[in-house]
């Protein structure tokens, strides 16, 4: 098995969240890239989170840190400039793609397309982190709020996969980020995923 794995290229299509550009990550972007080089990766896609289109769309830690949407948009633009620079700096050691991870909420498609037109990413990672305005992967408390807003666990799963389907249809991203992220804080996720109204949406999205 080891000999087989040694002949397989190491790649990453959804990596590179850094403490420099993401409030819930660590290390600088250059340190992240150096770690990929040291680990022997052939190529990597750096995919920081896109900036929120308004203060209401921020992550809880961004709100708690008093990081406004305007500041986060400026930081996101700085990320692109920094990543493009590192792309050139390490071009002889690692093939780097400068991309970003989308957010999905009402009105986000137009904003994503605006960012694509301005920054011209190498590709997109399409993700859903918010359902009914609640962040579903931050902590258990925020997840419970999302369940309450949806009315039930089953309804939350359905809304998540419906939002994901809309994102897939509208943006056609090259990569789907953590397809089943909705299960992160659901101890009974296998049972929930198996519910007919949920599973039919999973199959549709796949």
Pin down the residues of each PLM region.
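An N-terminally biased module of ancient metal coordination in phosphate/nucleic-acid-related enzymes
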Residues: 1-106, 111, 183-200
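Domain-core and long-helix interface of multi-subunit machines
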Residues: 22, 102, 118-121, 125-206
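Glycine-rich, charged/polar anion/phosphate-binding loops
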Residues: 110-112, 162-163
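A charged, amphipathic alpha-helical module
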Residues: 114-116
């Amino acid at each position: 098995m080891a000999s087989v794995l040694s002949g397989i290229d190491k790649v990453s299509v959804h990596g590179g969240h850094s403490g420099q550009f993401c409030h819930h990550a660590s290390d600088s972007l250059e340190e992240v890239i150096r770690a990929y080089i040291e680990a022997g990766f052939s190529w990597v896609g750096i995919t920081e989170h896109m900036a929120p289109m308004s203060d209401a769309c921020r992550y809880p830690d961004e709100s708690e840190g008093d990081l406004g949407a305007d500041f986060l948009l400026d930081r996101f633009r700085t990320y692109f400039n920094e990543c493009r620079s590192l792309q050139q700096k390490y071009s002889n050691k690692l093939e780097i793609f400068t991309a970003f991870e989308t957010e999905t909420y009402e009105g986000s498609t137009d904003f994503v397309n605006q960012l694509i037109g301005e920054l011209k990413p190498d590709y997109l990672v399409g993700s859903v982190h918010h359902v009914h305005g609640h962040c579903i992967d931050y902590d258990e408390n925020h997840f419970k709020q999302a369940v309450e807003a949806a009315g039930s666990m089953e309804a939350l799963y359905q809304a998540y996969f419906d939002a994901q389907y809309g994102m897939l249809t509208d943006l056609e991203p090259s990569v789907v980020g953590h397809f089943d992220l909705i299960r992160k804080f659901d101890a009974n996720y296998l049972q929930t995923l198996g519910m007919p109204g949920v599973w039919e949406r999973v199959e549709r999205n796949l």
